[in-house]
UniProtKB/Swiss-Prot annotation:
One of its GO terms (cellular component) is core mediator complex. It is found in: Nucleus. It comes from Schizosaccharomyces pombe (strain 972 / ATCC 24843). It comes from the Eukaryota. The lineage of its organism: Eukaryota, Fungi, Dikarya, Ascomycota, Taphrinomycotina. Its main location: nucleus. Keywords: Activator, Nucleus, Transcription, Transcription regulation. InterPro entries: Mediator_Med18. This is Mediator of RNA polymerase II transcription subunit 18.
Amino acid sequence: MQELYLLGVVPSRRFEAVVNSLSKTLDGPKTILEFWVVYRPKDVPPNLPRQPDSWLRLCSNIESHDETDTEWSKNTQWSMYLEGNSEPKREDKCGIRPVNRAKLTNGSVTEFVEKMGYEFSHEYIIQGLEYFFFDTTVRIYQTLIPSQQRSIKPPFHPMNEEQPWILHVYTHVADASNQVAMAKAEANLTKVKTLLSAFCDLKNVRL
């Protein structure tokens, strides 16, 4: 599966104005509250870097979970993501990168990931809002740090005091060889970029 995307940065002082504009222009919003756990490959020789594109990420929607439940991570539905590097030399176009996603339903997620050859790296929480434009998703969010490891009990801490909001616009195409679908997806991203140009400069940032 291919993800076509654009990214932008919204200063905290402009958040409310941007959200008001998004709510008038797009369908939504839907609240985002997700817990992400990142794993890196084990046994990488010291002289070689652990490339982020080879890392594995687990995601769970924690909005409906009881924040006092210390066993939530064993009972929740996890999705697993493997994301590749975005294509180079597309500065004036949208970014494109391969994304593989699978739902994990049975057994210990941690044991499963470790048996695949990964070890824990770090974790974070994404909190924000999600909008929709045809087949395109528009997310505005902040990345937060939980107060304790694997805890969903607030407060969550921003990574810095002046942390901006990230505007992530994306769509997925199942088959990259389907040029009609790829062109349609890129056209929809261009429409969203034009719609949001008054308050955010969306760009292709290499991931």
